């Protein structure tokens, strides 16, 4: 299973996987507007991969089969100040 990978110029560390290079017809317009102009990164064969960076390989394959695309976004950043406040008992929430 080949997939083309693009990175977002608007959203840091966000990647869009599509079935065919430069074919974004299955990607919803609101998502494309949020993602911005895609920048081509690479074409990869998912069948020959055991791992795929931070994305779950089976989830990517399923999304490509069902929707025709997969959006990989970075995990949410930790709020270190909030975590420190909780550890020190200073958080009133």
Curated annotation (Swiss-Prot):
It comes from the Bacteria. This is YcgL domain-containing protein PSHAb0508. PANTHER family: PROTEIN YCGL (PTHR38109:SF1). SUPFAM superfamilies: YcgL-like (SSF160191). InterPro entries: YcgL-like_sf (IPR038068), YcgL_dom (IPR027354). It holds the Pfam family YcgL. PROSITE patterns: YCGL (PS51648). Residues 1-85 form the YcgL domain.
């Amino acid at each position: 299973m080949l997939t083309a990978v693009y990175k977002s110029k608007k959203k840091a560390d966000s990647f869009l996987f599509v079935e065919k290079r430069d074919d974004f017809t299955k990607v919803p317009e609101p998502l494309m507007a949020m993602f911005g102009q895609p920048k081509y990164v690479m074409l990869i064969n998912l069948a020959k991969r055991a791992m795929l960076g931070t994305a779950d390989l089976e989830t990517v394959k399923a999304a490509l089969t069902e929707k025709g695309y997969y959006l990989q976004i970075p995990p949410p950043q930790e709020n270190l100040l909030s975590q420190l406040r909780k550890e020190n008992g200073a958080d009133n929430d």
